[in-house]
Design a protein with these regions (language model features):
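Active-site-flanking structural segment that lines cofactor/substrate pockets
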Residues: 34-50, 74, 78-79
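N-terminal non-catalytic cap/leader segment that marks the start of a structured domain
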Residues: 54-55, 139
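Low-complexity, highly charged intrinsically disordered N-terminal segments
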Residues: 55-66
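Short acidic (Asp/Glu) and glycine-rich catalytic loops that position anionic groups and cofactors
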Residues: 48-53, 190-191
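Internal amphipathic helical hairpin motif
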Residues: 65-102, 150-182
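Conserved, structured C-terminal
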Residues: 1-33, 38-43, 106-111, 116-441
């Protein structure tokens, strides 16, 4: 199979189809707001696969003898015990132990690391200090994400390569017949099940995207847009800045001098409470990633918190009658705050936090309610007092903006993640690939 170049119009990394009518400006790069209807797409990673372009943008490469040293002094992870050809989720903190940024990095070698996400702020600032023998470069790169039981099959069909031996977190270069570019595939994703990324040079983006859409048609591939990108993070149990909370970088005056936007605070939590819009690693159940065998920014605060943790991450499953009542109220003279679909507050919504009560006492903060057309439920991530409530307890979430009309939403405390709680899909980390048809045949 030789893939054909896209001959139609294009915008940045993407082809423009006749139904490509809604676009989203994601950090100055355009992506689809909604490719296929969200209620179809949100079933795709359980039934077939999707393709998503939303994190395409700049790829930053840090290279040189001090590349690992620079990263090590900024992140809570151990960057020295890390095999080349694999990726790792690095977490940057401020001195108070709040998450400044969290980013997936690829390790090419002991002196070269790459990322295609995040804001790149502190690596650039520290590199410019002259204290490190490093070089930082950037280029425009497409990143197309796939997830679902046929994601690997479609990728193999386009690359004409057997990738069944690619393990979780590994990446490797691949060729795409008909396209004279440099590409790589990585086994990673946030839906909680089988998932991959394809990356390559910006110029090939529209061609590669269309090739996968054509190849995946027989498997029912769907185009996921930014409107429903947050669904797999929420149900997959992967907390995400700009979705479930906001970066603590918004409290850094130097960052705000170059930031493209300010933090937008909505929800029933007082907007003056900026702390409720940020998280520590402990508050999103990421403390297991921290390694205290090196000095890093925020270490003292994180160590102190881990000795006496006060909050945890859980899932809240909302009472369906209460959600229906919110929508029914829109047809009266006294409506509650509207809930969009599938994300009740459209992206970017990390600054949205709602008060959570148990027996009338505030016990936590709930992020934006999010709907799944697969499970037919609406859930949210909740950072809750560690003894605030137990799994199975009922709590109240105050839906509505601070000072405005609010609706009490009943919710049941569920574990994080929801897909692991439901246990109806295989985990990407140990997915049985013998059940996946080989697309290179």
């Amino acid at each position: 199979m030789e893939n054909k170049r896209w001959e139609g119009p294009r915008r940045g990394f993407l082809p423009v189809y006749s139904d490509s009518t809604h676009w989203f400006d994601c950090a100055s790069f355009l992506c689809y707001w909604e490719g296929d209807p969200f209620y179809e797409t949100d079933k795709s990673w359980f039934e077939s696969t999707y393709i998503h372009s939303g994190i395409s943008g700049y790829e930053q490469t840090i290279s040189g003898p001090d590349a690992a040293k620079l990263l090590s002094e900024l992140v809570m992870n151990d960057v020295y015990k890390w095999r080349s050809g694999t990726c790792k989720h690095l977490v940057f903190l401020n001195e108070e132990g709040l998450i400044d940024d969290h980013v997936l990095y690829m390790k090419d070698s002991d002196d070269q690391y790459r990322t295609t996400a995040g804001v790149f702020f502190y690596p650039q600032v520290n590199a410019a200090s002259g204290k490190y023998d490093v070089n930082i470069t950037q280029k425009k790169t497409f990143v197309f994400q796939f997830s679902g039981p046929r994601s690997l099959t479609v990728i193999e069909k386009v690359t004409q390569t057997d990738l069944h031996d690619l393990k979780f977190l590994e990446f490797r270069p691949v060729q795409i017949p008909g396209f004279d570019g440099s590409f790589e595939v990585c086994r990673i994703g946030m839906s909680g099940t089988l998932a991959y990324e394809i990356r390559g040079e910006e110029a090939w983006g529209a061609d590669v995207y269309n090739a996968y859409l054509v190849a995946g048609a027989e498997y029912g591939i769907k185009r996921l847009g930014w409107r429903d990108y947050t669904v797999n993070h929420t149900f997959g149990g992967f907390p995400q800045q700009t979705v479930h909370w906001e970066m603590a970088l918004f409290e850094d005056p130097e960052f705000m001098k170059v930031a493209r936007t300010a933090m937008h605070c909505t929800g029933s939590v007082d907007p003056a409470n900026r702390r409720a819009r940020h998280r520590t690693p402990v508050e999103v159940n990421w403390e297991w990633m921290a390694k205290f065998n090196h000095d890093f920014k925020g270490r003292a605060a994180l160590e102190k918190e881990m000795q006496n943790p006060t909050r945890k991450l859980v899932t809240l499953e909302f009472n369906q009658e209460d959600i229906i009542d919110v929508y029914a109220s829109q047809f009266t003279d006294h409506p509650y705050k509207f809930m969009d679909m599938p994300c009740a507050e459209p992206q970017q919504c990390g600054g949205h936090q709602d008060v959570v009560l148990k027996d009338g006492v505030e016990i936590g903060w709930s992020s934006v309610p999010t709907y799944s057309s697969h499970y037919h439920v609406m859930i949210s991530h909740c950072t809750m007092d560690i003894h605030g409530a137990e799994i199975g307890d009922e709590v109240i979430v105050k839906w509505g903006d601070f000072g405005g009309v609010q609706k009490d939403l009943r919710a049941i405390v569920r574990p994080s993640s929801y897909v692991r709680y439901k246990n109806d899909v295989q985990d990407n980390r140990n997915y049985d690939l013998s059940t996946v048809p080989n697309g290179n045949r």
